[in-house]
């Protein structure tokens, strides 16, 4: 690979501090240990008000349009969403409603989510995966879900979560024809 991968990570939470942001940053950091990347982090909370006020892409301020273009031009997307009342936030869906229908075809997407308990873990497979299937993106088979119990003071403390983050990054690396560390083996 002659250039670093353009990795765009979208943290779909609107509040700070944010476990979703911490998880997104951990995924980016782990991925950077396996692949040469150029990362761009988008925090939904930072663009929430102007994004929410736009009913069409033509109404977006230039800085928000630039963020959508970054998503559309990514070599790899990381999309992490908090789970509220059984689903990802509506504003996150609104953002993807403004993405060009063909822009994400064959783009690998690493899915992640955070929620209050394990009962929301299926949001990865039952809500986020179908969203990106619509765009004909390639959702990676390993998603990462974290609960409040996996964090202390907005730091990841759970060893199983750390292992899942490592596994997700290691499984993503071969898609780009290179990997720097041997893959984890699951018994």
UniProtKB/Swiss-Prot annotation:
InterPro entries referenced in this protein's UniProt entry, alphabetically: Flavoprotein-like_sf (IPR029039), FMN_Rdtase-like_dom (IPR005025), FMN_Rdtase_MsuE-like (IPR019912), NAD(P)H-dep_FMN_reductase (IPR051814)
UniProt keyword list: Flavoprotein, FMN, NAD, Oxidoreductase
Organism whose genome encodes this protein: Pseudomonas fluorescens (strain Pf0-1)
GO MF, one example: oxidoreductase activity, acting on NAD(P)H, quinone or similar compound as acceptor
Purpose of the protein: Involved in the dimethyl sulfide degradation pathway. Catalyzes the NADH-dependent reduction of FMN.
EC supergroup of this enzyme: oxidoreductase
Reaction equations catalysed: FMNH2 + NAD(+) = FMN + NADH + 2 H(+)
One Pfam family in the UniProt entry: FMN_red
Superkingdom, taxonomy of origin: Bacteria
NCBIfam families xrefs: FMN_reduc_MsuE (TIGR03566)
Name of the gene this protein is made from: sfnF
Its EC number(s): 1.5.1.42
Gene3D superfamilies: 3.40.50.360
Listed name of the protein: NADH-dependent FMN reductase SfnF
Homology family: Belongs to the SsuE family.
């Amino acid at each position: 690979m002659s250039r670093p991968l353009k990795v765009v990570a979208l943290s779909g939470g609107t509040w700070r501090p944010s476990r979703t942001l911490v998880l997104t940053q951990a995924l980016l950091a782990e991925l950077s240990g396996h692949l040469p990347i150029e990362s761009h982090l988008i925090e939904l909370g930072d663009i929430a008000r102007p994004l929410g006020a736009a009913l069409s892409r033509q109404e977006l301020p230039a800085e928000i349009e630039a963020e959508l273009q970054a998503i559309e031009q990514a070599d790899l997307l990381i999309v992490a969403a908090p789970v509220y009342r059984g689903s990802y936030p509506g504003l996150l869906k609104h953002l993807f409603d403004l993405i060009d229908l063909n822009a994400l075809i064959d783009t690998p997407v690493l899915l992640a989510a955070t929620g209050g308990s394990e009962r929301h873990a299926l949001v990865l497979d039952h809500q986020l995966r179908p969203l990106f299937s619509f765009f004909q993106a390639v959702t990676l088979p390993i998603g990462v879900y974290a609960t409040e119990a996996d964090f202390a003071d907005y730091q990841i403390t759970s060893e199983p979560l750390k292992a899942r983050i490592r596994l997700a990054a290691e499984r993503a690396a071969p898609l780009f024809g290179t990997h720097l560390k041997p893959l984890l083996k699951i018994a």
